């Protein structure tokens, strides 16, 4: 669990924070894709993204956390969602793989973010960046994964 978890998990972030996190996720998935494809060092990718993009409305700390947290936990993240896949990990589209890793990271480490938000954000990222119908694949995987990682939240009917 991240040390940035909210003291009140039921509290909703302010609207501006929600938009800033959405932008952070969007940039993070692009940066993770670059990392997966080019293997460039994370600090170089982060510097490039911060230089090339307007971060005034981006949750920069969240972008940093995702960009560095996902690669650090890559093996654990992959083994967490791999049982939910309908094909071998090596056959997953690189964009969808970046989205699944990001979403799995949030489900595992950011319990302050409701599971429904994580799933919805993953779907929206796949609609924006993924292949045709990639959002359906991402939705299917995350729908199978959420009960395994957020069982108490689902049972409680929260969020």
From Swiss-Prot:
CC per GO annotation:
cytosol
Look up the domain of life of the source. Answer: Bacteria
Organism per entry: Pseudomonas aeruginosa (strain ATCC 15692 / DSM 22644 / CIP 104116 / JCM 14847 / LMG 12228 / 1C / PRS 101 / PAO1)
Query: Any idea what this protein is called?
Result: Transcription antitermination protein NusB
Which parts of this chain are annotated as the region Disordered? 1-21
Query: In Gene Ontology terms, what is one molecular function of this protein?
Result: RNA binding
* Keyword set includes Electron transport: no
The entry assigns this protein to a family as follows: Belongs to the NusB family.
Which InterPro entries does this chain map to? NusB-like_sf, NusB_fam, NusB_RsmB_TIM44
Q: Which NCBIfam families match?
A: nusB (TIGR01951)
């Amino acid at each position: 669990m991240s040390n940035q978890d909210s003291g009140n998990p039921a509290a909703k972030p302010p609207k501006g924070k929600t938009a800033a996190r959405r932008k952070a996720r969007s940039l993070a998935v692009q940066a993770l894709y670059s990392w997966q494809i080019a293997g460039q060092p994370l600090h170089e990718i982060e510097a490039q993204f911060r230089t090339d993009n307007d971060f005034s409305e981006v949750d920069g700390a969240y972008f940093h956390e995702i960009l560095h947290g996902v690669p650090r936990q890559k093996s654990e993240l992959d083994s967490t969602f791999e049982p939910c896949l309908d094909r071998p990990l090596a056959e997953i589209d690189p964009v969808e793989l970046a989205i699944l890793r990001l979403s799995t990271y949030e489900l595992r480490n950011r319990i302050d973010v409701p599971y429904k938000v994580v799933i919805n954000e993953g779907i929206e990222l796949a609609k924006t960046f993924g292949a045709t119908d990639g959002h359906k694949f991402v939705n299917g995987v995350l729908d199978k994964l959420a009960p395994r990682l957020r069982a108490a939240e689902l049972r409680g009917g929260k969020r």
